[in-house]
Amino acid sequence: MHNQVNRVGYEEDKERGVSVTQPPTGARTAVLLPGTGSDDVFVRSVFDVPLAAVGLKAVLPAPIPGADLVSAHLAALDEAARDEPIVAGGISLGAHLAAEWALRNPDRCAGLLLALPGWHGKPEAAPAAVAARYSAASVRALGPTAAIAAAIADVPGWLATELTRAWTGYGDALADSLDTAADRPAPTLDELAGLTMPCGVAGCTDDAIHPLEIATAWTRALPRAALCTTRLEIIGVDPEALGRATVLAWLKASQG
């Protein structure tokens, strides 16, 4: 008997000698966007293997730093869905933008993979938005190098490594990129209620920047959604844990 994940269909990948769960939709591609101040390298470490396990090709756009950050991410979704529907998603800001895009393109979105949403509606005092604004101000006051050093002073080693690489990659546009993300409204709960495709939501039980209450609220608002959780301390040693939680939630939502 196959486990719950494989009830949606599976086949043997003879080249790799593994059982590959088949996606419950006709989509063949998943486009995953990074979070605020993050990059495609981290997204790949989270989602590449879990997506391959369900037969989806991962498209992981790199951020375009600066004021065009959001529009470039949305354009990447448009381009990927030009010929056929896609599964869209991302982490934090990336999840917000995927849901925003799906609201405007419901016929081109076969599902949503929503990891660590940070707020719904206006960002206002959401911890993730406050943190991004504070970081942007620090970059402008101290310069990127000193701001990065201050940001990583009291965080776990894995997060320090991720922040250093990603923030360095944004170059002189780091502060503008952080502010652009912090000021972007996410879909409201009422808007999320209009998304009828299967949606997998993932949250962390120990993440103060992306409170689990937000992921729970998104899950309750979405008509066809499931929530799976993990912990930051696990992601620190196994980034794929976040991807597995999100993909598993999507598979569960697809069966409902």
Predicted regions, residues:
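Conserved acidic catalytic loop of the alpha/beta-hydrolase fold
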Residues: 52, 69-86
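Hydrophobic, aromatic-rich cap/lid helix
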Residues: 161-190
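Helix-rich cap/lid subdomain of alpha/beta-hydrolase
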Residues: 116-165, 174
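Conserved alpha/beta-hydrolase "acid-adjacent" motif
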Residues: 208-214
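Short beta-strand/loop motif that positions the catalytic acidic residue
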Residues: 195, 201-203
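Conserved HGGG/HGGXW glycine-rich cap/lid loop of the alpha/beta-hydrolase fold
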Residues: 2, 9, 13-67
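Gly/Ala-rich beta-loop-alpha elbow adjacent to hydrolase catalytic centers
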Residues: 90-98
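Catalytic active-site module of serine/aspartate enzymes centered on a nucleophile-bearing elbow/loop
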Residues: 225-256
